[in-house]
A protein has these predicted regions:
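A short, glycine/Asx- and small/polar-enriched loop/turn
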Residues: 27-30, 52-56, 91-105, 207-211
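Helical element adjacent to the flavin cofactor pocket in flavoenzyme catalytic cores
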Residues: 35-37, 58-107, 111
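Short loop/edge segments at beta-strand edges and connector loops
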Residues: 15, 47, 84-86, 90-92, ...
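Rieske [2Fe-2S] iron-sulfur-binding domain
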Residues: 135, 284-334
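Flavin-dependent oxidoreductases
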Residues: 91-160, 167
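C-terminal catalytic lobe of FAD-dependent flavoproteins
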Residues: 35, 45, 63, 151-152, ...
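A structural signal for short hydrophobic beta-strand segments in well-ordered beta-sheet cores
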Residues: 88-91, 156-157, 214, 297, ...
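Flavin (FAD/FMN) cofactor-binding and adjacent substrate-gating region
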Residues: 1-72
């Protein structure tokens, strides 16, 4: 669908091969290839990749693509009415309340990064957030494809025009991680570059089992749908969510509803990690608290922000809200 829509707009759409590589477990990659072939997807095992270090092989996915998401969104939303600065304070079946009144609709989709209905869906148990970092390096070798490590904390690589985009340093929001320092050390070692041309960070919402939550918000909220927990595959999963939710609202089945069901079992190992993280945040002795559910805020010296490790809310140095699920600013003057 992206390829079809991209033909109608200038969004720097580029067809490229994609690779998932491993540094340690080539057998895992071979099993992945076998599973993909069984399902009928074009994929192959390759031993040589265009990266500055040795790998144990990779899965190659031919004819994948990258594009500029803001230009793409500007095009597909050109005929829509988008109301900014309309902060939703309460969401219920059939209505959404904000400072200026109430919005009503028979069907509603909640698609924030982190859903904010604590009394429905138990999202505060089922979701957590991750930070990751990117540096853009100019005039370095073309890796001729898009690469991501199969390990959660691995590196990613792809080119855009004259730049190589190197990503990594991932960690749970509010916890110490590699961050910019890890990324800077890597580009210095492998590319001899002391300072990147551009650099930025991103935040992703993660589900307990790595599968997004797409479907009815909860059994007790008829007509209210949700799409969240896209992990680090937001552009891919958002299109899948659009298709699934459209079919559900129109009363048609896709066959994928049970896979992405937001009410599926949450008894996963990550649930216990989330629970322990929340308990640690609640019991940490500090006056600086997240307004979402009262967890302790921790100072992030690399980005000069106050971060919550429980659910991933982030605040500027003066307490102004940056990332949800918190719905307001934090009091950090204490």
């Amino acid at each position: 669908k992206y390829r079809e829509l991209a033909e109608e707009t200038e969004c720097d759409f580029e067809e490229k091969d994609a690779f998932v590589y491993t540094l340690t477990d080539w057998q895992k990659i071979e099993r992945e290839v076998q599973a993909l072939e069984t399902l009928g997807f074009p994929a192959e095992f390759v031993q040589e990749v265009n990266l500055p270090f040795d790998t144990e092989g990779a899965v190659k996915f031919p004819r994948q693509a990258q594009f500029q998401p803001r230009r793409f969104l500007a095009y597909i939303s050109r005929d829509l009415n988008i109301y900014e600065h309309t902060f939703i304070q309460e969401l219920a079946p059939g209505c959404a309340r904000y400072d200026g009144g109430t919005i009503t609709a028979r069907r509603m989709i909640a698609a924030p990064q982190f859903p904010f209905l604590n009394k429905h869906g138990a999202d505060f148990l089922k979701l957590y957030q991750h930070r990751s970092y990117v540096m853009a390096l100019k005039n370095v070798s073309d890796v001729r494809g898009m690469y991501v490590d199969e390990a959660q904390k691995g590196m990613s690589f792809r080119n855009y025009k004259d730049y190589l985009l190197v990503g990594g340093g991932s960690h749970r929001t509010g916890r110490k991680g590699g961050g910019w320092e890890e990324l800077q050390e890597f580009v210095q070692e492998y590319y001899g570059i002391g300072k990147a041309g551009y650099y930025w960070a991103t935040q992703d919402c993660m589900s307990l089992d790595g599968i997004p939550y797409i479907g009815e918000y909860s059994p007790n909220t008829p007509g209210l749908y949700v799409a969240s927990g896209f992990g680090k595959w937001g552009m891919t999963t958002s299109m899948a969510a659009a298709h699934i939710l459209t079919e559900m609202i129109c009363g048609r089945e896709t066959g994928w509803e049970a896979v992405f069901d937001p009410s599926r079992s949450i008894w996963k190992p990550q649930l216990f990690v989330n629970t322990l993280e929340a308990l640690a945040g609640l019991l940490t002795p500090t006056m600086k608290r997240c307004p979402h559910m009262g967890c302790a805020l921790k100072w992030n010296p690399q980005e000069h922000t106050w971060d919550c490790s429980c659910h991933g809310s982030r605040f500027e140095e003066d307490g102004k809200l940056i990332n949800n699920p918190a719905a307001g600013d934090a009091n950090v003057a204490k």
